Amino acid sequence: IRKHFPDIGFFRLLAWQNPEKELAKVFLVKYKGKIIGGSICLFSKESAYLWFSGGMRKTYAFLYPGILAVWAPITYAYEKGYAHLEFMDAGLPFKKHGYRDFVLRFGGKQSSTRRWFRFSWKWLNKLLCKFYI
């Protein structure tokens, strides 16, 4: 997996911090007992946020694990009555991005309301935080 993930303790904390309120859920795509895909969904009020999804699309191409990893949170959010499902990290609207093209096929439209940039110069980050926050 090429993405950077928090430590497993982070996910345990999400699951057990408030047992009465669901904060996150991990969805797994399995084939013959092997995990071939999965996704992580976060929940807040009436919105669900697809934080990460992925699948072994080359090895198990005909099983479509990446699509199933996205479909599971969509179905779950609908069944639980969430008003929205937002795909996180779909990329900038003016750059070519395969994942964005993929998620837009599920319907809806892209809105980049939660976007941040990080620069290697600390002074520039501090300055921009003062304007933004």
Positions of PLM-derived features:
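Short, contiguous acidic/charged loop-to-helix segments that flank catalytic cores in large enzymes
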Residues: 55-64, 90-94
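Active-site-proximal structural scaffolding
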Residues: 20-22, 66, 96
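Gly/Ser/Thr-rich beta-alpha loop segments that engage phosphate groups in nucleotides
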Residues: 56, 68, 109-110
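A conserved beta-strand-loop-helix scaffold within acyl/acetyltransferase catalytic domains
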Residues: 1-61, 75
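Conserved acyl-CoA
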Residues: 68-84
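Alpha-helical elements of Rossmann-like donor-binding domains used by nucleotide-donor carbohydrate transfer enzymes
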Residues: 10-13, 68-72, 98-101
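Conserved structured core elements
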Residues: 5, 66-67
